[in-house]
Curated annotation (Swiss-Prot):
Keywords: Chromosomal rearrangement. The lineage of its organism: Eukaryota, Fungi, Dikarya, Ascomycota, Saccharomycotina. One of its GO terms (molecular function) is protein-macromolecule adaptor activity. This is Increased recombination centers protein 6. The keyword Secreted does not apply. Involved in gross chromosomal rearrangements (GCRs) and telomere healing. GO terms for biological process: vesicle-mediated transport. It comes from Candida albicans (strain SC5314 / ATCC MYA-2876) (Yeast). The gene is IRC6. Belongs to the IRC6 family. Disulfide bonds: none annotated.
Length: 275
């Protein structure tokens, strides 16, 4: 089977290996912590859900190899990385990529640096599209914020970073969280897993679904919904649903038409699961 590819790009100590470990569940990855540079690492893994099976190559790269690099130096190195990435030499890599995760260290990366870096990420996003249709790329891009172990980042700073990322039409994921937020949306580590599992992959093998089990699950969900509708003591959480829809609509304003269609389908699936 032809493998799929995603790229995790970031500076040293920004959570790249943690993300790769989360996706692959590979116990060997932590042994790479002592490697001097993570540039060029490839983690080969596979993914199986109840619907499909696929092979996945997780490409890890660093645009700066020094933890002590200044913001100016990191930006210069990131821009240099982008110039190489968009060159003809890397055309084959761009063609096979299904996703990009850009990692930042929310404790050490300044707001100014993050803002400038996001502008370069936007250029990387454009380079992944077709020359005639700049946004005709079926992959995903997420900005993942991490924090060193046993350290805390202020909530106000996290919100400021999230707003900056969303204003660029990109998704922000805080690696320090997990579970669901108040709107029943997956967040943090669980959102990364959901993003990977729900993506429309280029190469995969569909698995046969047990039709009887599917019907059983469907009937059980319908019965649960019916009970919520007829039982006054059961709340349907309509306020949560409307809040989710309003948030989704606001987020969709910053997306292209093609991205809106995919995002709308994803939100609909989440609401159905929520019900």
């Amino acid at each position: 089977m032809i493998p799929n590819h995603i790229l995790i790009l970031g500076s040293p100590n920004s959570g790249k290996l943690r993300i790769a470990n989360l996706i692959s569940k590979n116990e060997e990855i932590p042994n790479l912590e002592d490697v001097e540079s993570h540039s060029g690492l490839i983690v080969k893994t596979s993914l199986r859900t109840k619907y499909y099976f696929l092979k996945l190559n997780i490409l890890i790269d660093e645009y700066s190899e020094s933890k002590e690099a200044t913001d100016e130096k990191k930006l210069s190195e990131l821009h240099k990385w982008y110039q190489e990435f968009k060159s003809e030499e890397f055309g084959e890599l761009r063609e096979v990529l299904d996703g990009l995760m850009f990692t930042i260290n929310m404790k050490t990366d300044s707001i100014s640096f993050i803002g400038d870096a996001l502008e370069i990420i936007e250029q990387i996003k454009i380079s992944l599209g077709d020359e005639e249709n700049l946004h005709d790329w079926g992959g995903f891009i997420a900005v993942v914020g991490s924090c060193p172990e046993n350290q805390i980042v202020e909530d106000d700073l996290i919100l400021e970073i999230e707003d900056m990322v969303l204003s660029q039409g990109l998704e922000f994921i805080n690696l320090s969280t997990e579970g669901e937020n108040e709107y029943k949306e997956k967040q943090g580590k669980d959102r990364i897993v959901e993003l990977i599992e729900s993506h429309d992959w280029t190469n995969l093998e569909m698995l046969k679904v047990d039709s009887k089990q599917y019907e059983t699950n469907k009937l059980a969900k319908m019965e649960s919904m019916k009970q919520k509708l007829i039982n006054e003591k059961e709340e349907l959480d309509l306020d949560d649903i409307f809040s989710k829809l309003n948030l989704a609509r606001d987020h969709a304003q910053s997306l292209t038409q093609d991205e809106r269609d995919k995002y709308a389908n994803k939100v609909i699936e989440e609401i159905i699961d929520f019900l």
